[in-house]
């Protein structure tokens, strides 16, 4: 069996001001997306991508669950409930498996933004997914969300977030 080697890129410092309202963050994202499409691809980075996923997740939750959530810590228990419901829908094949990957990206972006806004840290990418770096510790948000969506109830978001706050 081949040895596995974890490869993590350098930590990217967060450049987005998460103290802004959701409307302001949405406008910022749309403005930057236009600049990128208009010939400034250097503006695209992992943090920008995660913000886009996070904003998409807000829209998904509003449409599917008729629930408003935001980037505050108070949304963490709600996120656990949403992920549990989505997990059940995936496991019972009410949601096609290919949609699970899209949901995982969006939920990961959402949780990453909550972390950056309320705890701090930077963005990381690796050969096992995206994550955050807090005080030198890498936390793989994408994998945590993925395991929870696949039915691993030990991978709840609340305990993960509380552990990150201790770093």
Cite the ranges covered by each PLM segment.
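Amphipathic, interaction-prone secondary-structure segments
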Residues: 93-137
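Compositionally biased, intrinsically disordered low-complexity regions enriched in proline and serine
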Residues: 19, 29-30, 54, 124, ...
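Short non-domain terminal segments
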Residues: 2, 69, 121, 138-140, ...
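Generic structural signal for hydrophobic core residues of well-folded globular domains
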Residues: 83-86, 114, 118-119, 148-149, ...
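Arginine residue identity/basic-tract feature
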Residues: 63, 106, 144-148
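Generic alpha-helical secondary structure signal
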Residues: 22, 32-33, 57, 114, ...
């Amino acid at each position: 069996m081949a040895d596995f080697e974890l490869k993590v890129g350098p930590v990217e410092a967060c450049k987005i001001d998460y103290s802004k309202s959701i409307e302001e963050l949405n406008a910022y994202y749309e403005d930057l997306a236009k600049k990128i499409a208009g010939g400034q691809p250097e503006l695209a980075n992992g943090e920008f991508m995660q913000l886009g996923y996070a904003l998409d997740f807000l829209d998904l939750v509003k449409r599917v669950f008729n629930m408003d959530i935001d980037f505050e810590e108070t949304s963490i228990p709600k996120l656990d409930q949403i992920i549990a419901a989505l997990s059940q829908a995936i496991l019972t094949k009410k949601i096609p498996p290919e949609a699970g990957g899209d949901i995982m990206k969006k939920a990961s972006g959402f949780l990453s933004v909550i972390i950056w806004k309320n705890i701090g840290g930077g963005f990381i990418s690796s050969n096992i997914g995206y994550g955050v770096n807090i005080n030198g510790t890498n936390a793989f948000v994408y994998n945590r969300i993925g395991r929870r969506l696949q039915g691993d109830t030990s991978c709840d978001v609340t305990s993960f977030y509380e552990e990150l706050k201790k770093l």
